[in-house]
Amino acid sequence: LKTPIKTLLSLTVGLTASNIALASTYPITVTDVAGRQVTFDHQPQNIALSTSRIFPLLEIIYQKEAAKHLVAARDDMRVSAPSMYASYIKQYPSLKNVPTIGLIKSGEFDVERFINLKPKPDLFIVDLSNIKLAEDKGLLKKLNDAGIKVLTVDFRENPLKNTLKSVQVFADAVNRSKQGDAFAKYYTSHLNVIKETLAQHPNTPTPRVFIERAAGYSDSCCRTFANGNMGAYIPMLKAENIAIAPLDGSETGQMSPETVITSQPDVYIMQTTGWITNDGQPTSGIPLGYSPNHAAIKQATTDLMNRPWLQALTAYQQKNVYSIYMPFYNSPYNLVAIEYFAKWLHPSLFSTLQPEKTFEEMNLKFGHRHLSGQFGQDNFKAMNQ
């Protein structure tokens, strides 16, 4: 059967118009990860971020138009994830001109200046760690009175629970649910491979693991995570986090090298990157990330691995010391870190996992951009490359 072209065109236009009318029906109410109900009377266009390191959220939802929607953000990506910043600036040069805002937690956020920005934000995305303080300070009321909606997201405190909800609620709020659902489908399918593999091997040994938070950021050691942040991956991956007991219920805290030695982890993971200080000076972190400098990575890795107390650990002696790109700790792309952890904690079960390929694929699929880099490593191999 043949349908006349004119009829096909009429049907296509009719369907498209119908979809647009249906999708753009406002007001809509969404419930964010903080349990707040937020009602939107129109489709938000101008987005502000309380932390620029979650810019990938905009990329997932808006693809190549991500930068067009960003009208303000904190300047943390440039300092805390410089290779990420350089990569995005290359892709979206206009990001260099986005107005910067202060940190809510430190009291540097100027609400009056924010309200008067041009173009004016109509949606402010605030991370979960700052939302209660913003409410207590009266910032949420002032923003709401000015017509600026606030949506809470979380990729940091409880990533396994809140990552997909954060993406999907934002997608719903800006009338791009299809993009949110596509991301959720991809993320869930990859996560299920890990969960199902572990379920099929109930007798797999439970490795003891320690995560060194921000390795190389300062000379002191050892900040770490218990239940929150990347520490949340550990029980899901059928491993034991040695920080749980010493931190006694806290999400994050400090352990002495002596306590780490006493606990003797089987696997040691450094969460690190090539931070720069506010005045542009490099730190001693391992500069994993986009466009890696392998000589610099080798040197920084060697320096951190030469700490005498580290060499007293079982993990070191058995060559189970690894590094993960720290910005994954507050990113919707945290799936990549989970895959690295799975390989390192259970190498025999997950030898075929390819986390860097996953990251490249996610960026191409959701951000429509090609990238390469080094986002995780075996530290012993890095020292000998």
Where are these regions (language model features)?
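N-terminal ligand-binding lobe of clamshell/alpha-beta domains
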Residues: 23-385
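N-terminal signal peptide c-region/cleavage motif recognized by signal peptidases
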Residues: 17-21
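Bacterial N-terminal signal peptides that target proteins for export
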Residues: 1-9
